[in-house]
Amino acid sequence: MLKDILESLFCLFPIFYCGVRNLCRSHDWEKQAFLRTIKPGWSIIDVGANQGYYTNFFLKLIGQKGVVHAFEPIPSAFQILKNKVKYKENCFIHNVGVSSKNEVAQFFSPIEDSGKTSMKAHSCKLWNSLQKQIINSKVIRIDDFYPLQKLTKIDLIKIDTEGAELLVLKGAMETIKKNKPTIIFEACKECMKSFDYSVNDLDNFFSDLDYTNFRIVNKNLNSI
């Protein structure tokens, strides 16, 4: 509780908070990137919210005038997410996945680590060593999801879908064209292979939309 209160205070001064985390030699570079990027009042889409770690962090950065829409398809993770943000009036949570089609999809969810849930069974040894359950869940396209169409502006899309990132992006193409949001996501080559695409396909997607691509290296954003 105390840690959460202190972080809420630090988030009022994000650049100062970055400095503190650097002094503490924090290696959570994604968090550093969010601190340097997100502004009060922003509207954020959190795809693959899991148990709400970043959802809750975003709420601290955007303040009361911002809004977060968080998507999590796995019921057990969604329940934890729901409890974590239940008193946040500017946070809307959706128990669905996000993809390039509106349909029911199969998810492979490690029982001990729902954060590694994926719509494909990966071939890497670490992932294969985990005990998994298969869960069927509705998935939606961001472009077709009515609650998002009511937003006047979308400032940031965060994606963590263990390889399905390009599918999410393809289902959000019109939203991206209209809003030109900042997009931050993890890109794992092994996970991409399971979905039959590569880093080059991601680069081509963003080039077609006139985006500048960056890679987080340590605590810096490097143009690529």
List the predicted regions and their residue ranges.
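Phosphate/nucleotide-binding beta-alpha loop and adjacent structural elements of enzyme active sites
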Residues: 1-224
